[in-house]
Amino acid sequence: MKKKIWDLYAPIYEKAMRADRKCYKFMYHRVKSQIVGKEVLEIATGPGLLAKHVAPAAKRMIATDYSEGMIKEAKKGRYPENLVFEVVDAKHLPYKDDSFDGYI
């Protein structure tokens, strides 16, 4: 999809995903157990639902999305201090090789 569509969809994305809440809770638990104490990069975070839930288990987490609208939504409200949201194109990651212990 084009970036502009994701920017437009950003304000309602989280509400749309609520129908799958039970599935997400299961996923949060599984992911959290795999990233304990690790430096983690998440690609395509959207509004940061996963990142906000699992980041407390990580040493540090950078959650990225190429949609500025999604990152704007992700930065709303409270989130762990070890979590950073960045607008980044997954095709052109600005990080050095081996900068992270895990990827989502």
Q: What kind of region is each of these model predictions?
A:
Residues 45-92:
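Class I SAM-dependent methyltransferase SAM/SAH-binding core
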Residues 39, 59-60, 84, 99-101:
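Structural signature of beta-strand start/N-cap positions in the alpha/beta core
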Residues 1-35, 38-46:
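Conserved class I S-adenosyl-L-methionine
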Residues 91-103:
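A short acidic, Gly/Pro-enriched loop at the edge of an enzyme's catalytic core
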Residues 14, 42, 65, 89, ...:
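Acidic active-site catalytic centers that drive phospho-/nucleotidyl reactions
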